[in-house]
Amino acid sequence: MITKIEKYGATWCGPCKTLDKTLEKVKNIEIEKIDVDECPGDLLQEKSIRNVPVLIFYDGVLEIERTVGAVSLETINNIIEKWK
Protein backbone atom coordinates (compact mmCIF):
# COMPACT_ATOMS: atom_id res chain seq x y z
CA MET A 1 0.00 0.00 0.00
CA ILE A 2 1.39 3.38 -0.96
CA THR A 3 1.81 5.56 2.11
CA LYS A 4 3.90 8.41 0.70
CA ILE A 5 4.98 9.97 -2.58
CA GLU A 6 8.19 11.99 -2.85
CA LYS A 7 8.28 14.44 -5.76
CA TYR A 8 11.68 15.72 -6.84
CA GLY A 9 11.51 18.84 -8.96
CA ALA A 10 12.68 22.41 -9.44
CA THR A 11 11.01 25.82 -9.56
CA TRP A 12 12.38 26.49 -13.06
CA CYS A 13 11.04 23.18 -14.46
CA GLY A 14 7.84 23.46 -16.54
CA PRO A 15 6.93 19.75 -16.34
CA CYS A 16 7.43 19.93 -12.55
CA LYS A 17 4.84 22.71 -12.30
CA THR A 18 2.41 20.65 -14.39
CA LEU A 19 2.98 17.66 -12.12
CA ASP A 20 2.37 19.81 -9.02
CA LYS A 21 -1.12 20.63 -10.34
CA THR A 22 -1.76 16.93 -10.96
CA LEU A 23 -0.58 15.97 -7.46
CA GLU A 24 -3.10 18.40 -5.94
CA LYS A 25 -5.78 15.93 -7.07
CA VAL A 26 -4.22 12.96 -5.23
CA LYS A 27 -6.01 12.37 -1.93
CA ASN A 28 -5.22 10.41 1.25
CA ILE A 29 -1.50 9.97 0.52
CA GLU A 30 1.29 12.08 2.01
CA ILE A 31 3.13 14.00 -0.71
CA GLU A 32 6.55 15.44 0.03
CA LYS A 33 7.93 17.93 -2.50
CA ILE A 34 11.71 18.25 -2.70
CA ASP A 35 13.40 21.05 -4.66
CA VAL A 36 16.57 19.58 -6.17
CA ASP A 37 18.24 23.00 -6.14
CA GLU A 38 17.82 23.25 -2.36
CA CYS A 39 18.68 19.74 -1.18
CA PRO A 40 22.11 18.19 -0.60
CA GLY A 41 23.74 16.56 -3.60
CA ASP A 42 24.42 13.39 -1.63
CA LEU A 43 20.65 12.88 -1.20
CA LEU A 44 20.14 13.20 -4.96
CA GLN A 45 22.94 10.72 -5.54
CA GLU A 46 21.58 8.32 -2.91
CA LYS A 47 18.12 8.46 -4.53
CA SER A 48 19.61 8.30 -8.08
CA ILE A 49 17.87 11.53 -9.14
CA ARG A 50 19.30 12.56 -12.52
CA ASN A 51 16.26 14.19 -14.13
CA VAL A 52 13.18 16.05 -12.93
CA PRO A 53 10.40 15.59 -12.19
CA VAL A 54 10.65 12.24 -10.42
CA LEU A 55 8.00 10.60 -8.26
CA ILE A 56 9.03 7.92 -5.78
CA PHE A 57 6.22 5.84 -4.29
CA TYR A 58 6.72 4.29 -0.84
CA ASP A 59 5.11 1.61 1.28
CA GLY A 60 6.38 2.73 4.67
CA VAL A 61 10.11 3.22 4.13
CA LEU A 62 10.35 0.84 1.16
CA GLU A 63 10.50 2.33 -2.34
CA ILE A 64 8.09 0.33 -4.48
CA GLU A 65 7.78 2.32 -7.70
CA ARG A 66 9.23 5.34 -9.51
CA THR A 67 8.23 7.54 -12.44
CA VAL A 68 10.15 10.15 -14.42
CA GLY A 69 8.49 13.04 -16.21
CA ALA A 70 5.15 14.81 -15.88
CA VAL A 71 2.98 11.70 -15.63
CA SER A 72 -0.80 11.89 -15.79
CA LEU A 73 -3.24 11.58 -12.92
CA GLU A 74 -4.39 8.32 -14.53
CA THR A 75 -0.85 6.92 -14.34
CA ILE A 76 -0.52 7.93 -10.68
CA ASN A 77 -3.91 6.43 -9.83
CA ASN A 78 -3.00 3.20 -11.66
CA ILE A 79 0.16 2.89 -9.57
CA ILE A 80 -1.79 3.53 -6.37
CA GLU A 81 -4.39 0.89 -7.34
CA LYS A 82 -1.68 -1.60 -8.31
CA TRP A 83 -0.21 -1.49 -4.80
CA LYS A 84 -3.48 -1.55 -2.79
Language-model features: locations:
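Structural micro-motif
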Residues: 47-58
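Hydrophobic beta-strand anchors of alpha/beta hydrolase catalytic cores
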Residues: 5-6, 31, 55
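Local sequence-structure signature of Cys/Sec-based thiol-disulfide redox active-site neighborhoods
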Residues: 1-27
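Short alpha-helical
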Residues: 14, 38-39, 71-74
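Non-catalytic, surface beta->alpha helical segment in thiol-disulfide oxidoreductase systems
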Residues: 56-84
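Chalcogenol-based redox active-site neighborhoods
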Residues: 21, 46-47
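Structural microenvironment flanking redox-active thiols in thiol-disulfide oxidoreductases
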Residues: 36-44
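Domain-level signature for proteins that mediate thiol-based redox and metal-cofactor handling
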Residues: 29-35, 48, 73-74
